[in-house]
């Protein structure tokens, strides 16, 4: 089951929490779910190349029922804020027009973008659209993630690779990625890359560590250093041919 299901959804309520946090009556839930979807769609379309990794939406108090707090986690805060805050103000105006509510927009900078699955997937998809070799792109992404301190990473690209007539899937992995362990902090993302040969699917799994009792996922996302017998920072197998290569045909 752990190999098929979305790892983020499987761990909700166990070690992960929801990106939308609000408490309302049952009859209001469908409207707010739709509103959250439209808010995220507007933000992502408004700033497509701002490396957004997460959008949190909060409506926590009854007094502020008509007020929405939005937290945007991004690796490029300057792109969203703009010169003198112009871009941010335009986004707030569009959000107010969409929701007809007061919007409190907060921009949070992501420090280690090489450790976040969604940003890695965005980078891979962008390079594939620029006609980079899919094997080279995956190996470079894995190398950067290992340097950033992840405990394990797995990537997969599917579709007409290099313009082949038959679609297939090809991926790389390094380190541990225990998908069946519910306490394992797995960060997962999937995106599409639109190339001249068609649409390619990009998937990324990252293992940060196990969340033990009394810990949170923030405790597992501290940098991890690979070691081997030669006291090197990276595993010896990484320098001997690179990460493992896995080929599977797509039916």
From Swiss-Prot:
Q: Does the keyword RNA-binding apply?
A: yes
Q: SUPFAM superfamilies from the entry?
A: Prokaryotic type KH domain (KH-domain type II), Ribosomal protein S3 C-terminal domain
Q: Which CDD domains match?
A: KH-II_30S_S3
InterPro entries membership: KH_dom (IPR004087), KH_dom-like_a/b (IPR015946), KH_dom_type_2 (IPR004044), KH_sf_prok-type (IPR009019), Ribosomal_S3_C_sf (IPR036419), Ribosomal_uS3_bac-typ (IPR005704), Ribosomal_uS3_C (IPR001351), Ribosomal_uS3_CS (IPR018280)
Q: Name one GO biological process term.
A: translation
A Gene Ontology molecular function term of the record:
structural constituent of ribosome
UniProtKB keywords? Ribonucleoprotein, Ribosomal protein, RNA-binding, rRNA-binding
Q: Could you tell me which PROSITE patterns the record lists for this protein?
A: KH_TYPE_2, RIBOSOMAL_S3
Where's the KH type-2 domain? 39-111
Mention any one GO cellular component term assigned to this protein in its UniProt record. cytosolic small ribosomal subunit
- This protein's record includes keyword Cell membrane: no
Which NCBIfam families did the record assign?
rpsC_bact
Task: Please describe what this protein does.
Answer: Binds the lower part of the 30S subunit head. Binds mRNA in the 70S ribosome, positioning it for translation.
HAMAP family this protein is in? Ribosomal_uS3_B
Q: How does it assemble?
A: Part of the 30S ribosomal subunit. Forms a tight complex with proteins S10 and S14.
Please report which protein family the annotation says this sequence is part of: Belongs to the universal ribosomal protein uS3 family.
Protein name according to UniProt: Small ribosomal subunit protein uS3
Q: Which organism is it from?
A: Phytoplasma sp. (strain STRAWB1)
The gene for this chain is: rpsC
């Amino acid at each position: 089951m752990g190999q098929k299901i979305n790892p983020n959804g499987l761990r909700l309520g166990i070690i992960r929490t929801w990106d939308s946090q609000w408490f309302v009556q049952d009859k209001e839930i469908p409207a707010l779910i739709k509103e959250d979807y439209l808010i995220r769609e507007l933000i992502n379309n408004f700033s497509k190349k701002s490396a957004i990794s997460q959008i949190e939406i909060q409506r926590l108090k009854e007094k502020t029922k008509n007020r929405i707090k939005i937290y945007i986690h991004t690796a490029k805060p300057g792109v969203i804020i703009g010169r003198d805050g112009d871009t941010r103000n335009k986004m707030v105006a569009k959000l107010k027009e969409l929701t007809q509510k007061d919007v409190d927009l907060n921009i949070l900078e992501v420090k280690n973008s090489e450790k976040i699955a969604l940003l890695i997937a965005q980078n891979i998809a962008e390079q594939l659209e620029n006609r980079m070799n899919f094997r080279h792109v995956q190996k470079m992404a894995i190398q950067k993630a290992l340097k950033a301190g992840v405990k394990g990473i797995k990537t997969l690209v599917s579709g007409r690779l290099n313009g082949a007539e038959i679609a297939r899937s090809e991926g790389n992995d390094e380190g541990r990625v225990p998908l069946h362990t519910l306490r394992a902090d797995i960060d997962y993302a999937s995106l599409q890359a639109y190339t001249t040969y068609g649409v390619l699917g990009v998937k990324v799994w990252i293992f940060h560590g196990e969340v033990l009792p009394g810990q949170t996922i923030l405790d597992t996302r501290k940098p991890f250093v690979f070691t081997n017998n030669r006291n090197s920072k990276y595993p010896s197998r990484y320098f001997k041919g690179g990460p493992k290569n896995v080929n599977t045909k797509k039916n």
